[in-house]
């Protein structure tokens, strides 16, 4: 596999860039949130938090239709530059927003996301709205039913406006594909947004949406969260059930937003038991709408040292470690300590390969020229490994979970970097070296994220500051098994203490 894009994908990427026209200036590391004479009334609405927007709609100080039109206007102005939202259904959205306002006028019960616009990751099925999965095989695919997460989001009152960009079949952490091209980072338009929920994270960062859904196997909620200075939350396995029948603790859907409070609000709409999924958790999801503020005094924090010897770019560790004092100032007890990650290098890829083989092996056999090399590699590796390899991986996964329970008997949370590198050039598919160390495959450079996946715990990416080059860095906070609420409280306290997440690209 090459470290550059395939000719087909690269041509598509460059083509997408060509139609954007002149590029606006990007935000420097010291630029505050959007402000000044160029700020329009629409921009003021789109910069509000999801929680505040929802409250204003309930108070009838603004309507769902007004909120929708503000976001559509901003999408029209900004999205051609960043390519975050790849399918837009404005007329359908207007009809849904009108119906939402009419329900409110009749005094009907309103869901927690009432009137909030949202675009769904282009991996999940949306009835009547094109769902491409970033693949030419599905470029004209229009599902007839909604995925479970979309059903729950709509039932909670949100207004679907379209789909967000993703790599082909969600493989990789550079959001580009042959259908729509690449998504660009608002802080530096020559850099990637990460992936695979890159379109969603970019849309949030650029105030195109107040909330967005994503999914995560090896970091796909957390990596783009870090690189777009927003919050990406990977919930506990089973917290947000899926209807694909896989029941794997490796992959989960989850919420993304510009604040921890908004993530918690969103989680309250998509969490909850789903009878056909035996792994789904039964906790009342409305509990995630409680106030997050709480004292962190006495909380014991395990602080990252090297995650078992992983290489990190110096700016990643510098920015993260600069936040250690913030936890101490919050009253936490911070000490160097890490889980035992031995054996994860073999076990996680083994189980990951199986998921790709199950989903795409037959399609690849029938359409080999329409699959990118990294997906083909996943399928080939699954066919190379044997039953003993899978059994060992499953055993290591069970062993890891027992170890994690012992680890968190002493600590309330573990803090480590989300990524090992800063956002890289958009014309690079994946880094082949990190801090001088070779990365043989396209997933090796993301071990800091998928090591945490293997812990089977909730994990959140929260803005941690900016590198010397002006690019965002995320802090990854990992909570106890099924301790999603306590983790959100800690992340909220850190967010309030630092305010790193206030910075946004300054598109005039």
Feature-to-residue mapping (PLM):
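Short helix-loop capping/hinge segments that flank enzyme active sites or metal/cofactor-binding pockets
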Residues: 113-133, 290-305, 351-405, 417-421, ...
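Glycine-rich, small-residue loops and helix-cap segments
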Residues: 60, 115, 155, 159-161, ...
């Amino acid at each position: 596999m090459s470290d550059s894009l395939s000719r087909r994908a690269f041509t598509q990427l460059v083509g997408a860039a060509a139609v954007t026209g002149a590029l606006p200036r990007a935000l420097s590391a010291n630029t505050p949130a959007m402000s000044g004479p160029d700020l329009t009334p629409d921009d003021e609405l789109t910069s509000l938090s999801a929680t505040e927007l929802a409250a204003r709609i309930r108070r009838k100080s603004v309507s769902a239709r007004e909120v929708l039109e503000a976001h559509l206007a901003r999408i029209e102005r900004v999205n051609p530059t960043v390519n975050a939202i790849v399918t837009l259904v404005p007329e359908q959205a207007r009809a849904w927003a009108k119906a939402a306002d009419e329900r409110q006028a009749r005094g009907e019960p309103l869901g927690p996301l009432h009137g909030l616009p949202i675009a769904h990751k282009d991996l999940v099925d949306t009835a009547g709205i094109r769902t491409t999965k970033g693949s030419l095989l599905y470029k004209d695919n229009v599902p007839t039913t909604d995925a479970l997460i979309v059903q729950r989001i709509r039932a909670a009152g949100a207004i679907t406006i379209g789909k967000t960009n993703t790599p082909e079949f969600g493989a990789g952490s550079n959001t580009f594909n042959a259908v729509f091209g690449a998504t660009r980072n608002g802080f530096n338009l020559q850099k990637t947004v990460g992936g695979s929920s890159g379109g969603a994270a970019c849309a949030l960062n650029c105030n195109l949406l107040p909330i967005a859904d994503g999914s995560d196997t090896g970091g796909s909620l957390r990596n783009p969260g870090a690189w777009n200075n927003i919050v990406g939350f990977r919930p506990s396995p089973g917290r947000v059930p899926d209807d694909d029948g896989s029941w794997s603790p490796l992959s989960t859907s989850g919420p993304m937003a510009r604040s921890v409070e908004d993530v918690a609000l969103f989680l309250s709409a998509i969490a909850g038991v789903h009878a056909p999924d035996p792994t789904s958790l039964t906790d009342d999801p409305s509990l995630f709408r409680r106030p997050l503020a709480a004292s962190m005094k006495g909380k014991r924090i395990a602080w990252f040292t090297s995650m078992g010897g992983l290489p990190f770019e110096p700016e990643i560790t510098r920015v993260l470690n600069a936040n250690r004092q913030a936890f101490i100032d919050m009253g936490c007890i911070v000490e160097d300590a890490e889980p035992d990650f031995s054996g994860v290098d073999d076990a996680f890829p083994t189980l990951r390969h199986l998921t790709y083989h199950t989903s795409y092996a037959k399609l690849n056999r029938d359409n080999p020229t329409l699959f990118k090399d990294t997906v083909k590699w996943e399928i080939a590796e699954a066919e190379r490994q044997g039953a003993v390899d899978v059994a060992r991986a499953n055993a290591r996964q069970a062993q890891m979970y027992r170890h994690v329970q012992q680890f968190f008997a002493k600590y309330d949370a573990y803090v480590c970097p989300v990524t090992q590198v800063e956002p890289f050039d958009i014309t690079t598919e994946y880094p082949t070296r990190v801090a001088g160390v070779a990365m043989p495959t396209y997933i090796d450079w993301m071990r800091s994220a998928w090591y945490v996946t293997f812990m089977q715990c909730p994990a959140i990416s929260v803005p941690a500051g900016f590198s010397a080059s002006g690019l965002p860095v995320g802090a990854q906070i990992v909570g106890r098994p099924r301790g999603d609420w306590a983790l959100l409280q800690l992340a909220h306290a850190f967010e309030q203490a630092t305010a790193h997440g206030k910075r946004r690209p300054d598109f005039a």
